[in-house]
């Protein structure tokens, strides 16, 4: 077994598959574990994904938000065990893979550039509806057996 295959084998044990797919332009809420002193709490960071750097297990994504008039960017490792969950607040339609240009835009201009992606939003809603119906069907036989 060569070195690259061994590294992939070890990394595959730690790859997270429970996180949703998202793209640059999407607005996400990342729940991240933060350790302060001797206690741990979960901190939410909500903003626009401006970059995804895909590098296997070392994949990172950058989220940007404006807080009290100051732009804040945070880089998260995608497969980090400190990420509790990622919620997709809104799907955005971006025409570029790296959205560095939004650093120089106002909120209004950003909204104009990153329109909501209705097609992907509708697909997400349909998938959620199907999952709910599937769960209801799974519950019905249990009720009839009792």
Swiss-Prot record:
Region named Disordered: 116-146
Which domain of life does the protein's organism represent?
A: Bacteria
Q: Where is the composition biased (Basic and acidic residues)?
A: 119-146
GO CC list: cytosolic large ribosomal subunit
Q: Which GO terms describe its molecular function?
A: rRNA binding; structural constituent of ribosome
Give a GO biological-process term: translation
One Pfam family of this chain: Ribosomal_L19
NCBIfam families cross-referenced by the UniProt entry:
rplS_bact
Question: Would you identify the family this protein belongs to, as annotated?
Answer: Belongs to the bacterial ribosomal protein bL19 family.
Q: List the protein's name.
A: Large ribosomal subunit protein bL19
* Species assigned in the record: Thermus thermophilus (strain ATCC 27634 / DSM 579 / HB8)
């Amino acid at each position: 077994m060569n070195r690259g295959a061994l590294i992939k084998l070890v990394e595959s044990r730690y790859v997270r598959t429970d996180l949703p797919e998202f793209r640059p332009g999407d607005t996400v809420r990342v729940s991240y574990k933060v350790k302060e002193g001797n206690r741990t709490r979960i901190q939410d960071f909500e903003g626009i994904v401006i970059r995804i750097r895909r590098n296997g297990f070392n994949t990172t994504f950058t989220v940007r938000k404006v807080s009290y008039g100051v732009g804040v960017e945070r880089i998260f490792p995608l497969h980090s065990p400190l990420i509790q969950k990622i919620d997709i607040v809104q799907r955005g339609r971006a025409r570029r893979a790296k959205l560095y240009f939004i650093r120089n835009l106002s909120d209004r201009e950003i909204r104009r550039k990153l329109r909501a992606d209705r097609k992907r939003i509708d697909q997400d809603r349909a998938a959620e509806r199907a999952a709910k119906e599937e769960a209801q069907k799974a519950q019905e036989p249990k009720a009839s057996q009792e």
